[in-house]
Amino acid sequence: MNAYVVRLNNAVAAFNNDCMSTSRPLRQSDYNECAAIDSQTLTDFLLLRNSNAFADGSRWLEQKGNLQRAYIALDQYLTVIYDAWGLNLEYENPAEGVDRWMEPVRADQDASGNSMAAAHLNETLASISL
């Protein structure tokens, strides 16, 4: 999970750095990284969800549930950036459509401008005790 969080944080940083770039290959590469994270985390989530390696009533079964919730929270945060990239790539010059492609990001912000999905992910990660 920690490796995915690092990759997600890097993807968010790449979005912040590259979203206004007119280099389509750069923006496409950033979008592709989001797609790769999405695919890999879904695979790992499904493997965990379908695993029978945890005994009923054990503390590990509870942690399995916490890990599953962490994968879901990570995906929810990733989806904000992934969706924004998808809209961003519709524009040759992203400055022309900034209001449109920033919609997913703005929809995720609380009154202070902070990401609600990021806050939820951090809360969920704090619940994991391995």
What are these regions (language model features)?
Residues M1-S39, N66-L130:
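C-terminal amphipathic alpha-helix
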Residues S39, F45-G57:
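Amphipathic, heptad-repeat alpha-helical segments
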Residues S58-L61, G65:
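Surface-exposed short loop/turn segments
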